[in-house]
Amino acid sequence: MSDSAFVNGGREVSSLPLSAQMPGMASAADWVTLLKPRVMSLVVFTGLIGMLVAPGSLHPVLGAIAILCIAVATGASGAINMWYDRDIDAVMRRTKNRPIPAGRIEPGEALGYGIVLAVGSVLVMWLATNVVAAAVLAFAIFFYSVIYTMWLKRSTPQNIVIGGAAGAFPPVIGWAAVTGTIDLMPVMMFAIVFFWTPPHFWSLSLWAQMDYERAGVPMLPVVAGARKTRQHIMAYTVLLSVIAVLPWALGDTGRVYGLSAVVLSLGFLVQSWRVLRDKQDEVGLSLTKDAPARAAFKYSLIYLAVLFLALAVDRFV
């Protein structure tokens, strides 16, 4: 590796080669970290729900392989993301100890790792299920790794809005793995995750604003300010609440899901309202250390998990 510095927006981030910053051999845990297992768990869950609510059936072994392919593809995208974002990861407090900026894994190794896993996951999905599921999986990898990571993330404060599509594909993939088609129901599941993503990540970005600003990432709080971000969180939560009840309103689900969607959405609206009404200084910065934003972020995780679980329960009761 050369001694040249990483540069982000013309600003020097580090003048030392990565291996000199923290020399050492990578552990198995480092290679797992590249796969972003926390993100993977939620993606695998929504993909599994997509399979469970789909009409028809898939052999349990093939179903397990399909879920594994979704997990591996998600991990591959995470590895490619960490390879590309190694410069900004090095200056953000919550990411500076990741394997690449910490010097435990070489960038080229991470990229190769991600590409091999990506290609392998798509090929195995094709062989185990069908071409539709494999094609959507391939596009999801491309969307996250290229469109979001390499283009949107550093170019627009709407990066999360558009890039949220990448995380919304798994239930569609799960459905397609069983049916070989894409119908209205998986599209609505896609829409739920798509509109859930902005309030989820903007809540995080409010209390991690300084990190994003230091790294030069144009997240909405950095570009438009905290006050505008709170307004956007509220607006997208309203949209999400409407979309979440659509499967019930259109008769595609029963009361279990419908009541769950209503109650959970009311809870999310309350959380977002608290974010909107958070005590602020004259420039819109929180006087409570963004406690409401932290609470909304945590609630959003519960919201999506329970909502999708209700879809599966509703299917079998």
UniProtKB/Swiss-Prot annotation:
This is Protoheme IX farnesyltransferase. Carbon 2 of the heme B porphyrin ring is defined according to the Fischer nomenclature. InterPro entries: Protohaem_IX_farnesylTrfase, UbiA_prenyltransferase, UbiA_prenylTrfase_CS, UbiA_sf. Keywords: Cell inner membrane, Cell membrane, Heme biosynthesis, Membrane, Transferase, Transmembrane, Transmembrane helix. Belongs to the UbiA prenyltransferase family. Protoheme IX farnesyltransferase subfamily. Its EC number is 2.5.1.141. It comes from Granulibacter bethesdensis (strain ATCC BAA-1260 / CGDNIH1). It comes from the Bacteria. GO terms for cellular component: plasma membrane. Converts heme B (protoheme IX) to heme O by substitution of the vinyl group on carbon 2 of heme B porphyrin ring with a hydroxyethyl farnesyl side group.
